[in-house]
Amino acid sequence: MAAGDGDVKLSTLGSGGERGGDGSPGGAGATAARSSWVAALLATGGEMLLNVALVALVLLGAYRLWVRWGRRGLCSGPGAGEESPAATLPRMKKRDFSLEQLRQYDGARTPRILLAVNGKVFDVTKGSKFYGPAGPYGIFAGRDASRGLATFCLDKDALRDEYDDLSDLNAVQMESVREWEMQFKEKYDYVGRLLKPGEEPSEYTDEEDTKDHSKQD
């Protein structure tokens, strides 16, 4: 046998000594690597669980603070404990109004607030924060709001001192007026009609009045 062959066999045997017990190369190193990987995984998992626990504690603390102070703040906000004008007024009986009569119900001269849309008069007192003297739509209180709503105008130019028949509005604007009328019917009490000049008011019975209020409720 040549010396070179012997060297090769010895070298092969020597390298075989580095095999693991299962015959795989580098058994001890692989085991150590696996151990390190498992340890790292456990450490990462532990950190994640710790973070989740900390977040849960923070959320729990925030919830307890809200339960203790948040609700109290909501109940003691502006106007809390004070009854709205609508809560202190009896329900208005159905009747018809002239322009002059309607103007009395502007939230300043009387606590009740009325406005007209498309010839219908609505009691909007419960929406006083919108239609009261200081509200964003207070200009419509005690007035015919039809033209202003149809043209999206909140200026005095949208108001008429005389009866407004809306005859100069186009089809789109009139459709807008009708849509506003339906929305007011759904949300507020319909209390009567806005009278045209020379028109006589209708006489409403208690039964008709009760029936109308029942429909709105």
Curated annotation (Swiss-Prot):
Residues 196-217 are annotated as: Disordered. It holds the Pfam family Cyt-b5. The modification Phosphoserine is found at S84, S98, S202. Belongs to the cytochrome b5 family. MAPR subfamily. GO terms for molecular function: heme binding; heme transmembrane transporter activity; steroid binding. It comes from Rattus norvegicus (Rat). It is found in: Membrane; Nucleus envelope; Endoplasmic reticulum; Secreted. SMART domains: Cyt-b5. The modification Phosphotyrosine is found at Y204. InterPro entries: Cyt_B5-like_heme/steroid-bd (IPR001199), Cyt_B5-like_heme/steroid_sf (IPR036400), MAPR/NEUFC/NENF-like (IPR050577). GO terms for cellular component: endomembrane system; endoplasmic reticulum; extracellular region; glutamatergic synapse; membrane; nuclear envelope; synapse. Interacts with PGRMC1. Interacts with AAAS. It is a single-pass membrane protein. Required for the maintenance of uterine histoarchitecture and normal female reproductive lifespan. May serve as a universal non-classical progesterone receptor in the uterus. Intracellular heme chaperone required for delivery of labile, or signaling heme, to the nucleus. Plays a role in adipocyte function and systemic glucose homeostasis. In brown fat, which has a high demand for heme, delivery of labile heme in the nucleus regulates the activity of heme-responsive transcriptional repressors such as NR1D1 and BACH1. Keywords: Endoplasmic reticulum, Glycoprotein, Lipid-binding, Membrane, Nucleus, Phosphoprotein, Proteoglycan, Receptor, Secreted, Steroid-binding, Transmembrane, Transmembrane helix. This is Membrane-associated progesterone receptor component 2. The modification Phosphothreonine is found at T205. Residues 200-209 have a biased composition (Acidic residues). GO terms for biological process: adipose tissue development; heme transport. The keyword Secreted applies. The chain crosses the membrane at residues 40-62. Residues 96-195 form the Cytochrome b5 heme-binding domain. Glycans are attached at S15. The cytochrome b5 heme-binding domain lacks the conserved iron-binding His residues at positions 131 and 155. Non-classical progesterone receptors involved in extranuclear signaling are classified in 2 groups: the class II progestin and adipoQ receptor (PAQR) family (also called mPRs) (PAQR5, PAQR6, PAQR7, PAQR8 and PAQR9) and the b5-like heme/steroid-binding protein family (also called MAPRs) (PGRMC1, PGRMC2, NENF and CYB5D2).
